[in-house]
Amino acid sequence: MRNTLIAVTTVSLLAFSTASLAGPSRTTKGALLGATAGLLSGNGVNGVLKGAALGAGVGAISEKGRKGKKARKGATIGATVGAVAGVLSGNGIEGAIKGAVVGGAGGAIIGRIQ
């Protein structure tokens, strides 16, 4: 019950933050949708945070213009590094896939910010 309350509070804070109301970018919208999906998956705060990170990465990739181009370049590099790290960790193809997803999302967010 406590984890669910914390997760709902986290999503609420994201949804009603000043940045999300002022002019939500695709990255912000993706983070909100991902956080909501993570909450609905029943994994508590961990699911909310993972969902928000992946959603923000997908949102950053779909941005238009220069920010989107930089996000896509960052996602490519991040996915490559993540896949290699996943294989080297000894988890085989499953580790490579997880590493590519997480690395791609992180790389997209960082690429968009730069």
UniProtKB/Swiss-Prot annotation:
Belongs to the UPF0757 family. It holds the Pfam family Gly-zipper_OmpA. This is UPF0757 protein YmgG. It comes from Edwardsiella ictaluri (strain 93-146). InterPro entries: Gly-zipper_OmpA-like_dom, UPF0757_YmgG. HAMAP family: UPF0757 (MF_01455). The gene is ymgG.
